[in-house]
Amino acid sequence: MNTQILVFALVAVIHTNADKICLGHHVSSNGTKVNTLTERGVEVVNATETVERTNIPKICSKGKRTVDLAKCGLLGTITGPPQCDQFLEFSADLIIERRDGNDVCYPGKFVNGEALRQILRKSGGINKETMGFTYSGIRTNGTTSACRRSGSSFYAEMKWLLSDTDNAAFPQMTKSYKNTRREPALIVWGIHHSGSTTEQTKLYGSGNKLVTVGSSKYHQSFVPSPGTRPQVNGQSGRIDFHWLILDSNDTVTFSFNGAFIAPDRASFLKGKSMGIQSDVQVDANCEGECYHSGGTITSSLPFQNINSRAVGKCPRYVKQESLLLATGMKNVPELPKKRRKRGLFGAIAGFIENGWEGLVDGWYCFRHQNAQGEGTAADYKSTQSAIDQITGKLNRLIEKTNQQFELIDNEFTEVEKQIGNVINWTRDSITEVWSYNAELLVAMENQHTIDLADSEMNKLYERVRKQLRENAEEDGTGCFEIFHKCDDDCMASIRNNTYDHSKYREEAIQNRIQIDPVKLSGGYKDVILWFSFGASCFLLLAIAMGLVFICVKYGNMRCTICI
């Protein structure tokens, strides 16, 4: 007997096309990437540059009292060489030193000149008053061909004191000046180092020369050093200029017996200004608050990569050429329509990391499908909430950096006056520290922005979930399948947070009962397939055994057991 058994399997697929509402955000692939505390190169929807790299190649002086010193060096405004005659007294908001400006005419130098230069740069100008010194028995009109006006002359604010006649003895003298003003006085004097001992004797008589200067806070003695030196401006002698700040009601006393360049007037600094060294053109038609040797930086950004020596109200210098500040959420392209496998938190992680192309009205938005079709709309409330928190982020960053950098600048100002060129190393160290700090601050703000965007999306998602309750089911992709008919007005009520779940509750329950028994989530499909396969095998085995049993019973089959 030949028996053939045919087994057919019937698979029924029940498809539901439920109304659905989804949550997402606007994306626009633009390649804008920022760094956060935990990740580098995170693509975001929007970002703002925080490092300025361009400037105006002019000194913008509109609205400022500008003093362009031209051939005059800034220190020369105190002593008065011929090239500085028009700048002996002035008022300024902006002082411009040129590279070919000169502080002296008779060769020499200012001791601690850079510290004095810093003081003058920050002053708003200079006025002067006579010190009232009178002399007898000596000449006070020493001149030199190195300081020429109509002929040989000397520093306008100094007196070159000489013996009454050549080679005559120079008498011992003492002169004092008391500062009777409320503000400190700047006092400058000089020590003349002759080109030879013979020249010194001719000018001041024979014997050793000594100059002593003292006040309540200052005391110093100076011995001139005659000797042969290379000629500068036709002179082999040198004048060293020294200075001190004389407090109000304090007195300075000079004691000398030759080789002394005496001050004629005391200088008083007034107000505040900015001083820069630059050779670029001055433009009175543009405005600026930040200057450097190459021009004017006009920027509202917190950092700049143009010049570390910029002065004024400036962005702080950093080494980085770019530090992007995120002003929008993380930019993740729209996921394919084919659903991806997700973990336990897929419903949350899914929509946060999924953006929709093409929406320009807002960041956070809804998509829906129903019998009337599909639609997309922005959620302005969530969008505005995020914008309100992100707006002003750049200004807050400026406040943070300005406050910190200003403290550092103030801390090192006094050091600069005391140790001069060591400040160059200090500034380099400050740049290193604050370049790192700037990168860290921007990364922290970027992390906060991205976390904020996720937080606002979570709030929006929870708002929708609490409205729908049992009338809908999350599908793990940031969408809700709604168990009742939801027209455009219904969808609008969900978006506007005016949805009444009780109105649709009965319909939703009925539809849920019909859908749930046949709705298989992806996690159970494999289990049911294996169960079906096992049951089919068992059924085939049972049928085969039944046929064998019937055949044996009716004699159609004999079973012989051999031992």
From Swiss-Prot:
Extracellular side: 19-529
Disulfide bridges in this chain: C22-C479, C60-C286, C72-C84, C105-C147, C290-C314, C486-C490
Record topological domains on the Cytoplasmic side: 551-563
Leader sequence segment: 1-18
Keyword Glycoprotein: yes
UniProt-annotated glycosylation sites, renumbered to this chain: N30, N46, N141, N249, N424, N496
Positions of the record's site feature: Cleavage: R342, G343
Membrane-crossing residue ranges in chain numbering: 530-550
Annotated localization: Virion membrane; Host apical cell membrane
InterPro entries in the record: Capsid_hemagglutn, Hemagglutn_HA1_a/b_dom_sf, Hemagglutn_influenz_A, Hemagglutn_influenz_A/B
Post-translational modification: Palmitoylated.
Key word Ion transport present: no
GO CC list: host cell plasma membrane; membrane; viral envelope; virion membrane
One example of a Gene Ontology biological process annotation: virion attachment to host cell
UniProt feature coiled coil, ranges: none
Described purpose of this protein according to its UniProt entry: Binds to sialic acid-containing receptors on the cell surface, bringing about the attachment of the virus particle to the cell. This attachment induces virion internalization of about two third of the virus particles through clathrin-dependent endocytosis and about one third through a clathrin- and caveolin-independent pathway. Plays a major role in the determination of host range restriction and virulence. Class I viral fusion protein. Binds to sialic acid-containing receptors on the cell surface, bringing about the attachment of the virus particle to the cell. This attachment induces virion internalization either through clathrin-dependent endocytosis or through clathrin- and caveolin-independent pathway. Plays a major role in the determination of host range restriction and virulence. Class I viral fusion protein. Responsible for penetration of the virus into the cell cytoplasm by mediating the fusion of the membrane of the endocytosed virus particle with the endosomal membrane.
Similarity comment text for this entry: Belongs to the influenza viruses hemagglutinin family.
HAMAP family: INFV_HEMA
Note: Major glycoprotein, comprises over 80% of the envelope proteins present in virus particle. The extent of infection into host organism is determined by HA. Influenza viruses bud from the apical surface of polarized epithelial cells (e.g. bronchial epithelial cells) into lumen of lungs and are therefore usually pneumotropic. The reason is that HA is cleaved by tryptase clara which is restricted to lungs. However, HAs of H5 and H7 pantropic avian viruses subtypes can be cleaved by furin and subtilisin-type enzymes, allowing the virus to grow in other organs than lungs.
Assembly and binders: Homotrimer of disulfide-linked HA1-HA2.
Descriptive protein name: Hemagglutinin
Source organism: Influenza A virus (strain A/Chicken/Weybridge H7N7) (Influenza A virus (strain A/FPV/Weybridge H7N7))
Protein encoded by which gene: HA
